[in-house]
């Protein structure tokens, strides 16, 4: 039976029970709970140092008012990085390849920043729709263009994450299939392809981490416009 190339992105089912909730919950079981005995270990210091470095870059565009969002952004970035990396393991499901989940994250976060801006600084928020110094004849057109640009932000945010992860998974699937197919023709050629697959896997791990960082920092930039 031929299996579709995109079947790896289907939500898994077992006995007619959807396992997508299990795929979302299980990664958190991999984290060691914080406690006095864990606070001074090397792994904890590595986690603290890494998160401190990343969050200092993510929160850099914001002023003091934006630092109340640091817990949300750090949790978001850590969750996306974890789900992206775990999805690279065999026989696992990657929730972040589903556009529905990514839009479920992008739309509320984007909408929260927009509502915050219009609620606290309505004049400044409306001023973003028309660049300063624009000709009067172009003002209606620019307002429409800027409005569409703002409305497209959550879609672009979700599509960027989905497309990057989906493309990487498909490429790894194709190359791994080529490795198995070439074993019957040439062991050396199959070994070279396997080496390429190893390098691609390392690249995909980096992409998985970077995409979580990019998602968080773009939401930060959206918030910065409305503070």
Swiss-Prot record:
It is found in: Mitochondrion inner membrane. InterPro entries: ATP_synth_F0_asu, ATP_synth_F0_asu_AS, ATP_synth_F0_asu_bact/mt, F0_ATP_A_sf. Keywords: ATP synthesis, CF(0), Hydrogen ion transport, Ion transport, Membrane, Mitochondrion, Mitochondrion inner membrane, Transmembrane, Transmembrane helix, Transport. Pfam families: ATP-synt_A. Gene3D superfamilies: ATP synthase, F0 complex, subunit A. The chain crosses the membrane at residues 14-34, 69-89, 98-118, 137-157, 169-189, 205-223. One of its GO terms (cellular component) is mitochondrial inner membrane. It is a multi-pass membrane protein. GO terms for biological process: proton motive force-driven ATP synthesis. One of its GO terms (molecular function) is proton transmembrane transporter activity. Its main location: mitochondrion. NCBIfam families: ATP_synt_6_or_A. Mitochondrial membrane ATP synthase (F(1)F(0) ATP synthase or Complex V) produces ATP from ADP in the presence of a proton gradient across the membrane which is generated by electron transport complexes of the respiratory chain. F-type ATPases consist of two structural domains, F(1) - containing the extramembraneous catalytic core and F(0) - containing the membrane proton channel, linked together by a central stalk and a peripheral stalk. During catalysis, ATP synthesis in the catalytic domain of F(1) is coupled via a rotary mechanism of the central stalk subunits to proton translocation. Belongs to the ATPase A chain family. F-type ATPases have 2 components, CF(1) - the catalytic core - and CF(0) - the membrane proton channel. CF(1) has five subunits: alpha(3), beta(3), gamma(1), delta(1), epsilon(1). CF(0) has three main subunits: a, b and c. PANTHER family: ATP SYNTHASE SUBUNIT A. This is ATP synthase subunit a. It comes from Branchiostoma floridae. The lineage of its organism: Eukaryota, Metazoa, Chordata, Cephalochordata, Leptocardii.
